[in-house]
Amino acid sequence: MKTSDYLKKYGVKLKKHLGQVFLSDDRIAKRIVKEVGLTPEDVVVEIGAGAGTLTEELAKTGARVIAYEIDESLAPVLRERLSKYPNVELRFEDFLKAKDIPEGAICVSNIPYSITGPIMEKIIEWKFKRAIVMVQKEVGERILAKPGKKTYGYLSVVVQTFYEVKKLFDVSRSCFVPNPEVDSTVVDLRRKSVDLDFEKFRKFVSMIFAKKRKTLKNNLRPFLSVFEGVDLSRRAEQLTVEEIVEFYEKWRRALECSKE
C-alpha cells in the first residue's frame, strides 16, 4: 500500500503548525538506508516517523529502530504499516524532550522542516555517532557552507565543529505528500572526537554571529580585554571553524578565570 493510501484510509489530516510533509517515494527511503549500511546490531533513532515510509525501510535491516512521532493521529498508520517488525519501537512524543537516547545510536531522519534548527542542536547534544538527515535544500546548503559564503553562519559552525559533513544527494519535492515548495538534500554527518561544552560553545557562536555584517570587535565588545593583541577586524563569516574554536577557548578560559 502506498503512503498516500495509508493516509486516506485513516483520514489523516495534515497539521500546518507541524509543517508536515511525508516522504512518499520508497525509492528514496531505500537509497537513504543503503547509504547508512545498517546491521542488526545497530540502534537507529528516527525523528518524525510521519507515515512510516522511511521507518519501514529502516525496519527491514533488522536494526533496532526507535521512531519518534509527535502527532498521535498517525498512530493507526504507523502501527498497521510496521506491525510485522518487532524491532521497531514507536514513541509518540516530542523528540526535543527525549530523555533516554541509547549511547552509540545512529540518527536517520527526514527532519521536520519547521524545527530543523532545534533538532540539529539536539543531534549534537545527544552525541549521535552518525546522522543521515534529509533537510530543506537551503538548510543543507547552510550545514555544508564554507567561510566567506552567504550561507555560512551559526548552523554551519556548530554542526561542522562536531561533525564531518558530506552531501549525499538532492531529493525532488515531488517525492513528498503534499509537495512542499522546495527540494530537499540528504546530508551525512559523522561525529568528530571533540571535547567542547556544547551549550557554552553554542552561546559563543550565537554571539559572534548575532550581527553578521559586524566585525568581531563589535560583536565581542564586552570581552575586548580577553582578545588583546588579537586581530578582531574580520567578521565571523570569514573565520574557519577551527579559528572560531580558538576564539571560543580564549573566551571560555577568561570567563573561568574571572570566576576564581
Curated annotation (Swiss-Prot):
Keywords: Cytoplasm, Methyltransferase, RNA-binding, rRNA processing, S-adenosyl-L-methionine, Transferase. It catalyses: adenosine(1518)/adenosine(1519) in 16S rRNA + 4 S-adenosyl-L-methionine = N(6)-dimethyladenosine(1518)/N(6)-dimethyladenosine(1519) in 16S rRNA + 4 S-adenosyl-L-homocysteine + 4 H(+). It is an enzyme of class 2 (transferase). Its main location: cytoplasm. GO terms for molecular function: 16S rRNA (adenine(1518)-N(6)/adenine(1519)-N(6))-dimethyltransferase activity; RNA binding. SMART domains: rADc. The keyword Signal does not apply. It holds the Pfam family RrnaAD. It is found in: Cytoplasm. Belongs to the class I-like SAM-binding methyltransferase superfamily. rRNA adenine N(6)-methyltransferase family. RsmA subfamily. Specifically dimethylates two adjacent adenosines (A1518 and A1519) in the loop of a conserved hairpin near the 3'-end of 16S rRNA in the 30S particle. May play a critical role in biogenesis of 30S subunits. This is Ribosomal RNA small subunit methyltransferase A. It comes from Thermotoga petrophila (strain ATCC BAA-488 / DSM 13995 / JCM 10881 / RKU-1). The gene is rsmA.
